[in-house]
């Protein structure tokens, strides 16, 4: 699928728990149990859930998530935003960086090694939140890759629900994380509905994301219906807004779709 250059991806992760049974762990089946993180990527313009990944809070998991996102971009480079986890910048440089040979200095000695630098089209900004007593007291935005004016202009093009200009933030993905907890029983806190292992949790996330993208219309994406029709609004799903689908899918269509 092809996305425009104004697309904004917001990687984010949140924590969940899989209670670990010591007897199961003793039998060698405990690797997929215990605490884990859910990594997610979201396109706010279309309210599209791009990828979800169950893993640890490591560089390896960040690489897997961004490789999934890369498969959705069809070669385009959007504006990336995230929290201040350093793994995102490292992996973005791996995937979208270029090797640059330093200019010779004319001085004696061993020449400098080639360096990995960001490509001119790569744009990435971070949001850092400082907390005191469990409350956010300060929010700082920093631009890691890209020109400041270009990043700010692209972020401002994303309109908020009240019509005001957007800014560099992670509020959309955080709100979608709340919706995900409401939709998926496995993520509910202090209940007996927890996942028993990571594999089943990953399958549940994939289904919920597909249902939200193709089956469930989003109120912020609806369009004004033609005056001759009986409807006031035409419902649209995130997949329709992104140009992936031309209709609202039924649940049966999703379950019977052959990938």
Language-model segments: residues:
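Residue-level recognition of single "structural anchor" positions
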Residues: 1-259
């Amino acid at each position: 699928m092809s996305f425009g250059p104004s697309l904004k991806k917001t990687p984010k992760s949140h924590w969940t728990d899989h209670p670990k049974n010591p007897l199961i762990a003793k039998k060698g089946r405990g690797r997929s149990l215990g605490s884990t993180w859910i990594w997610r990527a979201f396109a706010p313009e279309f309210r599209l859930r791009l990828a979800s990944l169950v893993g640890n809070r490591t560089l390896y998991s960040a690489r897997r998530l961004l490789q999934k996102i890369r498969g959705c971009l069809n070669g385009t480079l959007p504006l990336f935003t995230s929290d201040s986890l350093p793994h995102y910048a490292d992996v973005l440089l791996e995937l979208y960086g270029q090797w640059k040979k330093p200019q010779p200095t004319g001085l004696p000695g061993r020449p400098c090694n080639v360096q990995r630098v960001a490509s001119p089209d790569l744009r990435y900004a971070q949001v850092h939140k400082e907390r005191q007593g469990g409350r956010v007291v300060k929010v700082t935005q920093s631009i890691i890759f890209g020109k400041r004016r270009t990043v700010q202009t692209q972020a401002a093009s994303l309109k908020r629900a009240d019509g005001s200009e957007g800014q560099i933030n992670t509020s959309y993905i955080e709100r979608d994380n709340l919706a995900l907890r409401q939709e998926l029983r496995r993520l509910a806190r202090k209940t007996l509905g927890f996942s028993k292992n990571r594999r089943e949790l990953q399958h549940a996330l994939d289904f919920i994301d597909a249902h939200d993208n193709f089956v469930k219309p989003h109120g912020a994406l609806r369009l004004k219906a033609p005056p001759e029709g009986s409807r006031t609004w035409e419902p649209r799903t995130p997949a329709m807004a992104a140009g992936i689908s031309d209709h609202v899918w039924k649940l049966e269509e999703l379950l019977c779709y052959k990938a």
